């Protein structure tokens, strides 16, 4: 189903807000798909035991509530394997969100909250 989506990422460590997408997206049950302005496809899946955030060709973030998971991020320096920890999440008809932390080895390198506002059919 074609929808309008507003996706924002909040970097809690750096107190930054980034608008990821404001425009058309697609909703298929528990899967949300959209293109960033640069043409990079993002896919978000809320599954029974895991939330997956994929920036196709760049990263796959695996999140499990109150558990450490392993994620892959491709950088100009190669592929990084990071640990992720899901703090909170919600999924309803209008808003999906996740709050998670990223660790490289045991060092905290990121704390993010990502919100996807689903505003209905276009």
Question: Could you say what each language-model-derived stretch is?
Answer:
Residues 1-122:
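Terminal leader/tail segments of proteins
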